[in-house]
């Protein structure tokens, strides 16, 4: 990876610490969260905060804080916030796929999955994708054409692991209260969902042992990428449609300028601002990394790209979502690696 790309990714991670955390102290968002924790309250539910989940005090405090933060997103009383959460959650599917694939490069599957389950995944959930994903991408190598695809297990089961370990807990946590689930049960479901990196990694590890790799690598990659692309694009289009149908302001896609912010008026406004920075910075990091990888694989410089490609890329970011475009670039590079490998093998024979 070039020094420029590494510096750009690290800069995004450092800026995330400033925009997300420092400014959250300055604009009063952290104080609002602390007040709700002190009064054991949730947004719109005074005195209804559940504080015991595992019996392990540090973990219980973390899960309690997660419930205070995510409750407005899952409750659905602020449509803009909930729909933005859907778009962000769907964009995490291709982000995580790229991280899973590249973490396996030159690694044993067990070691790679353990790193994802107990290091990278918990950091993403604890500190946020906007801060952690740029840092993870900054240490991932960029391979050149001719390199084998970066996994030694059936990545075609990535969709199954994400559906069971990520999407299903997400849907259950989003069930309406009190019509379908009780308030306490919803908080427990939100707490359960926080462990999705562990669940998905363990599911892939179990499949690795129970079902040896059978399908070709390029076919597995196509299955996993098609699933991730569908998730990301569907979430982005749903939010676009809602913003259009409800005449919502399109500025909801982008976070406010941090040094011009006012005090947050509500917990919902603070959560939306926090998620906006998380999504914007993590998606930007994905685009930076995949564009750099594409340029390295094709031997092109960014300035040498045609204006038509740039226009289509910008249109794709708007109408498909930034992570969908990043995944398309990554897939083209990965399949090119596979194709070049096969081509070289044919030539040598």
From Swiss-Prot:
EC number: 5.4.99.-
Pathways involved: Secondary metabolite biosynthesis
KW Nucleus (keyword) present: no
Topology of the protein relative to the lipid bilayer: Multi-pass membrane protein
Segments passing through the bilayer: 81-101, 116-136, 155-175, 189-209, 223-243, 308-328
Localization per record: Membrane
This protein's record includes keyword Transcription: no
GO CC terms in record: membrane
GO molecular function, one term: isomerase activity
Keywords: Glycoprotein, Isomerase, Membrane, Transmembrane, Transmembrane helix
Carbohydrate attachment residues: 80
Main localization, broad class: membrane
Stated role: Part of the gene cluster that mediates the biosynthesis of the indole diterpenes janthitremanes such as shearinine K or shearinine A. The geranylgeranyl diphosphate (GGPP) synthase janG catalyzes the first step in janthitremane biosynthesis via conversion of farnesyl pyrophosphate and isopentyl pyrophosphate into geranylgeranyl pyrophosphate (GGPP). Condensation of indole-3-glycerol phosphate with GGPP by the prenyl transferase janC then forms 3-geranylgeranylindole (3-GGI).
Record-stated family: Belongs to the membrane-bound ascI terpene cyclase family.
Protein name: Terpene cyclase janA
Organism: Penicillium janthinellum (Penicillium vitale)
Gene: janA
